[in-house]
């Protein structure tokens, strides 16, 4: 059985009236260890035949077998395996990757074989040394002469063993001396047992082969053996290694090439990232603003009392009949305070009237409350003391004032111990509250607090309260407590003539509202991310077009479609991840500036938003990078190699 066997191979280019018959019923066989020169003039079809033999192209009809296996039935990755494991290509124009060193160019086929990094580099160095390039391992193609580049190409062809060497006009771009050197190397490869198939138009070059096949107008016109065949010997073949290092090395190589591609076009890459940067920065900043404002509002709500339920007369806020309902009493507050889930209950009554100190009259609001009211509402004392349980029991004529009252009446003096009149009733100032700055603004209303017994018995003369504030124990469910209080009061009053305001309901409403707003604004900001993703896809399509030749070279040395797909997909994801990280950094910088100048509420960048931003940018890279990457992976090797 012959190593290579072709029967009735035909190849056509074009279609319809422009269809050209390039190869016409080509039949030949090549034995293991042959050195075959295919000679012919330009346009004769010799290069097309070699491309088919090298599995870079496919025949229009006919049979092509390698070791008896029909190649027409092979999938693209199976053909890539042949090129990777058994073939080695020496091109007329060298086809080296300009961004890689000589060592890396030579080692590249072994990446797709799964060879470890150290072993790969050592083998590449040995091949370069054997070809007289030991001192050029770190040089890039642009730093080498034509002859040196071709020797690098030969070393690359041998990296995975190169059982069958395909040489396409190997001396065509070289001077005479370099050409002779290259031909001497090829002859030595043949003598070492490699099967060599060489294409040339020069009879002098063809004379180096032991068999010459001449093609004219797509047909074989002669097939002669000029020299005795050299007995074939086994050529060492590198075995593919399917291990974790196999996938790791391929990923590292793809990542490195992606970084080089991004850095090769810095400005273009930056402009491509711009849409991602703006989108991510917008989303993270909006979420940070939402988090900051939500946190501030919830803190303010907490400062007004957490786990609290306020009970009011009537059916709800704005109920005109609530003023006529007088069933909410001190006894209700006392019964409520005895419930197992209640920490405390404080009634509250209020009265508006004239506040007088010396010759100054002001309009103020006096609130009659229990001694626990301040703790429940989170109000802080600045100076003096708060009234206690005894003050409540004894109807003590004491009062605690707010900062507004202090500023109006005692701007230049200490208010403690002073007597003020409210609705002509004397009250002694025993304490001053701190300014209560919360999300609902700073009221200019003058506020005072006295024991509810004092207000009810000495000022309003009423026996009912305006409200009852209930503090629920920390281990109790406020929803269950609210339901229990409602049933208790309904039983006492005989009707539901009250309504409740649960602080947790306000908290949940704020969280829900701010969450909805964050989602809405983030959705708008996401539009810029989509635009950025389209920009990435556009640039990646341009990159595929620009690097078509590189794709062809990688396929020729054995890259699978998955390898090409992976490389371009990594490049797209890399651009988006870098853009995402820069966007997060930009948002962090904005938040620092914002928090420096704005003190009402901070921008709060959470770890979740950062992780989400990076994940989102990665997803955009995958989503918008897949089409260009898939286009690159589906290129035909010979078509890709033909691009300049």
UniProtKB/Swiss-Prot annotation:
GO cellular component, one term: plasma membrane
Regions that span the bilayer: 270-290, 524-544, 574-594, 607-627
Keywords: Antibiotic resistance, ATP-binding, Cell inner membrane, Cell membrane, Membrane, Nucleotide-binding, Translocase, Transmembrane, Transmembrane helix, Transport
GO MF term (any one): transmembrane transporter activity
Membrane topology classification: Multi-pass membrane protein
A GO biological process held by the record: response to antibiotic
This enzyme's EC code(s): 7.6.2.-
Subcellular location, record wording: Cell inner membrane
Function: Non-canonical ABC transporter that contains transmembrane domains (TMD), which form a pore in the inner membrane, and an ATP-binding domain (NBD), which is responsible for energy generation. Overexpression confers resistance against macrolides.
PANTHER family per record: MACROLIDE EXPORT ATP-BINDING_PERMEASE PROTEIN MACB, MEMBRANE COMPONENT OF TRANSPORTER-RELATED
Name of the protein this chain belongs to: Macrolide export ATP-binding/permease protein MacB
Organism lineage: Bacteria, Pseudomonadati, Pseudomonadota, Betaproteobacteria, Neisseriales
């Amino acid at each position: 059985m012959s190593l290579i066997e072709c029967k009735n191979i035909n190849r056509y280019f074009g279609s319809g009236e422009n269809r050209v018959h390039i190869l016409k019923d080509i039949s030949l066989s090549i034995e293991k260890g042959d050195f075959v020169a295919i000679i012919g003039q330009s346009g004769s079809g010799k290069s097309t035949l070699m491309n088919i033999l090298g599995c870079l192209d496919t025949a229009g009809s006919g049979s092509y077998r390698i070791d008896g296996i029909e190649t027409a039935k092979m999938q693209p990755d199976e053909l890539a395996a042949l090129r990777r494991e058994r073939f080695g290509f020496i091109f007329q124009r060298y086809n080296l990757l300009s961004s890689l060193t000589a060592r890396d160019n030579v080692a590249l086929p072994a990446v797709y074989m799964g060879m470890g990094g150290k072993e790969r580099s050592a083998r590449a160095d040995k091949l370069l040394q054997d070809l007289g390039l030991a001192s050029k391992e770190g040089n890039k193609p642009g730093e080498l002469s034509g002859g040196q580049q071709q020797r690098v190409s030969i070393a690359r062809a041998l990296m995975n063993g190169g059982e069958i060497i395909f040489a396409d006009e190997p001396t065509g771009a070289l001077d005479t001396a370099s050409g002779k050197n290259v031909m001497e190397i090829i002859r030595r490869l043949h003598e070492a047992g490699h099967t060599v198939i060489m294409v040339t138009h020069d009879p002098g070059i063809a004379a180096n082969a032991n068999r010459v096949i001449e093609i004219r107008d797509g047909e074989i016109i002669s097939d002669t053996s000029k020299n005795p065949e050299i007995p074939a010997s086994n050529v060492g073949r590198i075995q593919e290694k399917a291990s974790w290092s196999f996938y790791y090395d391929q990923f590292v190589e793809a990542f490195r090439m992606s970084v080089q591609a991004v850095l090769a076009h810095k400005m273009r890459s930056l402009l491509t990232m711009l849409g991602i940067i703006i989108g991510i920065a917008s989303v993270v900043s909006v979420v940070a603003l939402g988090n900051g404002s939500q946190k501030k509002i919830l803190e303010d709500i907490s400062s007004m009392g957490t786990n609290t339920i306020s009970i009011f007369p009537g059916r709800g806020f704005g109920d005109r009949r609530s003023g006529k309902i007088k069933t909410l009493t001190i006894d209700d507050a006392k019964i409520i305070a005895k419930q197992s889930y209640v920490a405390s209950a404080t009634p509250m009554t209020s009265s508006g009237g004239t506040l007088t100190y010396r010759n100054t009259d002001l309009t103020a609001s006096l609130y009659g409350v229990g001694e626990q009211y301040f703790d429940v509402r989170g109000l802080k004392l600045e100076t003096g003391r708060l009234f206690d349980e005894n003050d409540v029991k004894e109807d003590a004529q004491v009062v605690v004032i707010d900062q507004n009252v202090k500023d109006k009446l005692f701007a230049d003096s200490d208010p403690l111990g002073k007597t003020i009149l409210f609705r002509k009733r004397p009250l002694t100032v025993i304490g001053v509250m701190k300014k209560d700055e919360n999300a609902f603004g700073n009221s200019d209303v003058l506020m005072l607090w006295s024991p509810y017994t004092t207000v009810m018995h000495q000022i309003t003369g009423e026996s009912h309260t305006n409200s009852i504030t209930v503090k629920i124990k920390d281990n109790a469910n406020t929803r269950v407590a609210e339901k229990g209080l409602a049933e208790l009061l309904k039983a006492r009053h005989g009707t539901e003539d009250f309504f409740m305001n649960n602080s947790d309901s306000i908290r949940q409403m704020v969280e829900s509202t701010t969450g909805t707003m964050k989602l809405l604004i983030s959705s708008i900001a996401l539009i810029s991310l989509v635009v950025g993703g389209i920009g990435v896809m556009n640039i990646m399509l341009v990159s595929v077009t620009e690097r078509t030749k590189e794709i062809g070279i990688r396929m020729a040395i054995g890259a699978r479609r998955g390898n090409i797909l992976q490389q371009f997909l990594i490049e797209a994801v890399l651009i988006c991840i870098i853009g995402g990280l820069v966007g997060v950094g930009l948002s962090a910088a904005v938040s620092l500036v914002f928090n420096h100048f704005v003190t009402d509420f901070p921008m709060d960048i959470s770890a979740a938003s950062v992780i989400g931003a990076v994940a989102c940018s990665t997803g955009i890279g995958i989503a918008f990078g897949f089409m260009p990457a898939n286009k690159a992976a589906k290129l035909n090797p010979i078509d890709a190699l033909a691009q300049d």
